[in-house]
Amino acid sequence: MTQKFEMADRFDASAVEQALYQHWEEQGYFKPSENPAVPSYCIAIPPPNVTGSLHMGHAFQQTLMDTLIRFNRMEGNNTLWQAGTDHAGIATQMVVERKIAAEEGKTRHDYGREAFINKIWDWKAYSGGTISQQMRRLGNSIDWQRERFTMDDGLSNAVKEVFVRLHEQGLIYRGKRLVNWDPKLHTAISDLEVENKESKGSLWHFRYPLSNGVKTADGKDYLIVATTRPETVLGDTAVAVHPEDERYQSLIGKTVLLPLANREIPIIADEYVDREFGTGVVKITPAHDFNDYEVGKRHALPMVNVMTMNADIRQTAEVLGPDGKPLNTYQAIIPADYQGLERFTARKKVVADFEALALLDEIKPHDLKVPYGDRGGVPIEPMLTDQWYVSVKPLAEVATKAVENGEIQFVPKQYENLYFSWMRDIQDWCISRQLWWGHRIPAWYDESGNVYVARTEAEVRIKHNLPLDLPLTQDEDVLDTWFSSGLWTFSTLGWPEQTKELKMFHTTDVLITGFDIIFFWVARMIMFTMHFIKDENGKPQVPFKTVYVTGLIRDEQGQKMSKSKGNVLDPIDMIDGISLADLLEKRTGNMMQPQLAEKIAKATRKEFAATPTLPAGGIAAHGTDALRFTLAALASNGRDINWDMKRLEGYRNFCNKLWNASRFVLTNDKLDLSAGEVEYSLADRWIESSFNRTVGEFREALTQYRFDLAANAIYEFTWNQFCDWYLELTKPVFANGSDAQKRATSKTLVSLLEKLLRLAHPIMPFITEEIWQKVKHFAGVEGDSIMLQPFPIVEQAKLDADAEQQINWLKELIIAVRNIRAEANIAPSKALDLLVRNVTQQQAVILSENQLLLTAMAKLTSISVLTAGEQAPLSVAKLVGQVEVLVPMAGFINKDTELARLSKEIDKLHNEVMRIESKLSNEAFVAKAPEAVISKERAKMAEYQSGIEKLQAQFKAIEAL
């Protein structure tokens, strides 16, 4: 080497990462090409909430996405990773409502709708970019100039377009149906926003008197009805029994007198009833229970709504027919002393009144799940409200076929069944929400209640020929957030305009997401996309070809991470590190329950206590590459992941290993990259072959979305082949090889390091770029960034099975000698004589050709091959297959120690022989196993038995000393 090359002792991630990322972004490396001839590869990122900050789930999924994007960019594909954030209607509105309440003592109603929405936009401008900045810290190679927000003008236009077209096609309608109602937030919420909490409740058994003198089979003049919700009694419109329940056969079609309300309601038969639950008789309240609502539809029952939007008892019941229209012929009176009562107060009063009327039969303890709104924090109430709906069955049929016929693949495949189960039992989708923040529904009303749907008010007037002075009022509701995010893959590419981006990048390639939103988001994207996006032949396009479903990231004990458990880990803290004091503040600050905070603090202090290397406690800095590599290495298909700080630490060490290996190569003053004759060694050929096999393994793993196997292939090659063996195998060449051998090894070292960096780059972008910028000059490679270099391919000509086999055998010999040293407590510096016996002719040639390598690696003075029958001096022996590896004992081996070691080796081989004998004596195994398998087992047993004989002979010889 003509000049000394300097390289820092260690990789300082904190000094490198952000500057590198800024450079990448400024240079426009993340931007896709505009050349339509280049094959495209596109991933649309699941848009995180604009309110949010990066959590481990984001870091996990985005690491996998960026790995695919960087790999495909290096493959020469035109890559687009479409990023953006979701306006997150209810979550964002609540954040800003809490903010103005805390800072100004005001509510949104004090501001009014327009001013409050402006407040949200101000908040979004100030703090809405937090998550985007954190995504940069992860190294995400996103074209940020294309970042989208679901409330952008372009996306808002797409939302209006979809709404209007679906309405014109009769697939969007307005109707009164049962929804999850949050009585605190005054909005309908989706099933995803409902949290079912285990609760110790009661099962009340009420007596409903039979009408007209009718009696039960056992002579009673009443039915006992079991319920967990007495407060809805006033809304009952039937009681139901199972059609095959013999106890009540004679009563089907008769009536009972509803207590408190004093109206007759029918006894109906329906298979929904569980004969084993309670008494086998249940009350049917179609206006206040989802199952009862379906029963009511089947039996054309009226619906009696007895609750206000606050979940208080109404002054006057709202009575509707099964079609959702007012039913004036049905009388449902609410007693005066119930009117205005809060629902749980009403519950107590109903129970007390039944007891006073001698109609309370019994109360039993009952475990149940109570549905809570995850934002409002109060029990939700099934409520009949006027809402907008999408009739999704026609869309679902097409979307189901796309998965059935393989246009869309789920990985792992079992999630297809979950998808099918939802899609084949799909219900109309309530898309309206009683919020202010979101896409306002493009519908207007005149004073007569007529509804007009169009993109704008001006379009309404033109379309329906309405005079300018006719007052119109826009619908107050906004659309469910999932409605706009359902358009994500095509609205972000410019639809409804037929943009070049839409033509180039749609269909996208893969969606990486969690199983919990397969229905709420994935299915709706498939439905909407296939309905609105068609190819040039009119065939519906799918939004993506593959859905890769990830598991959850859990804590080390397998618990779900949550603030209330105090076990949340921030990915940025994994990267930068955090002191114990700051971690405690982050985990316990602003907690409502001080007792819980102390428990969390105690657990955190124990888990992240001070250590000699981290005197302040907390979490050490690991850098982004170590975090990404850990996430990839843990990404086993579809399984939840228990986070492991030890693995993170191990992969930080792996980054250091790669850095140190690079230092060894680049600062080696014997490196000779001059032109001239080259003579490649066996080790050179072996490492090239091993590398190419690793490239094949990595590529295959990525094709199967086995990120764990891809990461492991890099780790195994880098640590166990390149660093632990090849770098050591080069030292004898540089010390004693010819000029041609030194040149060959130098070129192999540099070339292989450069290719290895390219192989690892998709998972570990920062350290590979930093080293590559140094190594490219040595390797004679032109280019501005490693990410723009080609990804390594499998070079078939460099696959060399013979070289791999020979090196692996030599490694076994070296390991055998090293083990003898360790077990006999011989100093590493002590040079040894080596004897080998029972070698084949080919093995003898390998030994002869690699004397330099063996003597250096095993610290030997000589290597001698014993001929058949030639006696060896008293030696310590190891077996490598049939070959005996012998180190003469003279002067440095303890007799007792060696006898103990031999005894242990003999026992080990005895156990192997017994295991095989047991297998071969098993008639079922012998009958079913192929002959080749049986022959292989017998050959192994013969080899072990031969080994035992040799070791026993050695044992006897030493014992006789």
UniProtKB/Swiss-Prot annotation:
Keywords noted in UniProt: Aminoacyl-tRNA synthetase, ATP-binding, Coiled coil, Cytoplasm, Ligase, Nucleotide-binding, Protein biosynthesis
Name the record gives this protein: Valine--tRNA ligase
Gene Ontology terms describing biological process: valyl-tRNA aminoacylation
UniProt KW Calcium keyword: no
Encoding gene (name): valS
InterPro entries the record matches: aa-tRNA-synth_I_CS, aa-tRNA-synth_Ia, Anticodon_Ia_Val, M/V/L/I-tRNA-synth_anticd-bd, Rossmann-like_a/b/a_fold, tRNA-bd_arm, tRNAsynth_Ia_anticodon-bd, Val-tRNA_synth_C_sf
MF GO annotations: aminoacyl-tRNA deacylase activity; ATP binding; valine-tRNA ligase activity
Subcellular location, record wording: Cytoplasm
Reactions listed under catalytic activity: tRNA(Val) + L-valine + ATP = L-valyl-tRNA(Val) + AMP + diphosphate
Subunit record text: Monomer.
'HIGH' region (motif): residue ranges: 48-58
Functional description taken from the UniProt entry: Catalyzes the attachment of valine to tRNA(Val). As ValRS can inadvertently accommodate and process structurally similar amino acids such as threonine, to avoid such errors, it has a 'posttransfer' editing activity that hydrolyzes mischarged Thr-tRNA(Val) in a tRNA-dependent manner.
Domain notes: ValRS has two distinct active sites: one for aminoacylation and one for editing. The misactivated threonine is translocated from the active site to the editing site. The C-terminal coiled-coil domain is crucial for aminoacylation activity.
HAMAP family associated with the record: Val_tRNA_synth_type1
EC identifiers of the protein: 6.1.1.9
Superkingdom as given in the UniProt entry: Bacteria
Main location group: cytoplasm
Species assigned in the record: Haemophilus ducreyi (strain 35000HP / ATCC 700724)
Enzyme class, broadest EC rank: ligase
